[in-house]
Amino acid sequence: GIAVQELFDVLGVDSDHIAIRTSYYSSMGERNDSVQVYGLSYLIKKLESEDSLLIVDDVFDTGKSIDQIIFDLKTACKKNTPEIRIATPYYKPSQNKTDRQPDYHLHETDKWLVFPHELEGLSAEEIVQNKPELKDLLDKITPKL
C-alpha cells in the first residue's frame, strides 16, 4: 500500500489511496466460505456518488474478495456509492466464482503465482534458498537452520 502511494506521489497523480484487507479464515484458523473485509470505514465516510473508485488487487482469481468489498461498500454507502472499477495485474478467469471480472488486467493465467514479497507457507530453509538476502535476518530471529 505505501509503495503504491509513493508511486502516485512521484507521478503527480492526485489520489486518496488506502489499503483494504480481506480474510477467508475464522479465528480458529479454519477457512470460511465468507470473506471478512477490514478497513472500509474511511471509504464509507469519504465516498460520494460523484466519486470514482478503483479497487486494485494483485490477483483476481475467485473474485470473492472483490465481490464482498463491493457488496459491503454498496450496503454502507447506499445512494453515495461511487462508480467502482477493478484492476489487477493477473486475472484467472477459470477460477472466477462471481459474475464480476476486472475492468483492467495485464495477464490471464491459470498458474499458481508466488510473488517476491511472499513468505507465508515457506519453511525457513525455503526462504533462505529462494531469498538469500534474508538469511542474516532469519539467523537473528530463528534457531540455526
Predicted regions and their residues:
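PRPP-associated nucleotide enzymes
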Residues: 1-145
